[in-house]
Amino acid sequence: MAVRPKKALVTAPAFSEYERALGTVGAEVQYYRLKEEQDFRIQEDILEQITEDTDMIFLCNPNNPTGQTTEKELLIRVMNRCNKFGTILVLDECFIEFLEEPERYECRGYLTQYPNVVIIKAFTKIFCMPGVRLGYALCENAALRKRMRAMLQPWNVSVTAQEAGVAALVDCEAYLKRTERIYKKRKVLDDRADEKAWSECMGIGSKLYIF
């Protein structure tokens, strides 16, 4: 890792690779536990767990595996809290394009104001390229970007991944519109889920991670 946090905060449940990455540098991992009675959504009380000892936070929006979203207003308060303590906030937005209104949640417009924020994005999810590892980070902090580059492996993006990325960008708007049309058809799946009494486990924001 480009940053070696001593103490970090992750949600539980969350994508397991966050904790794994933190473990490689011996960081103490603390958990903000998502509760079923709150629909597994992040609440205001997460701010109380961000202290001067918190070096890094990982948040995923929409969350993996619950699919629940966090409103931008709360994320801004989290960013302000992190800014106060010099905490690095890593926002994973790899699934955000699957949301009906992604612009309502994405935070790239705040990067200049909050240089301690790093946004993670990926081609893998939205362009259906499983197994092709192609992702990127957005960050306004030049010093942090330099440290991240220094930690990259040589040839960290394969030629195959590069070609796939270029091909995806050629007609990306049309592809995203097709994805949007498919997304809007999810009501059929919702109705079937209700018939099977699955509505409780599927009553989530983006409904991406059930299968």
Indicate where each model-derived feature is located.
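PLP-dependent aminotransferase class I/II
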Residues: 19, 116-202
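Short Gly/Ser/Thr- and Asp/Glu-enriched loop/turn motifs at secondary-structure junctions
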Residues: 203-209
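Phosphate-binding glycine-rich loop
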Residues: 1-8
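Short beta->alpha connector loops at strand-helix junctions that form conserved
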Residues: 12, 31-36, 93
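Structural motif
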Residues: 9, 56-60, 90, 136-138
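Active-site pre-lysine segment of PLP-dependent enzymes
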Residues: 23, 41-53, 65-89, 93-126
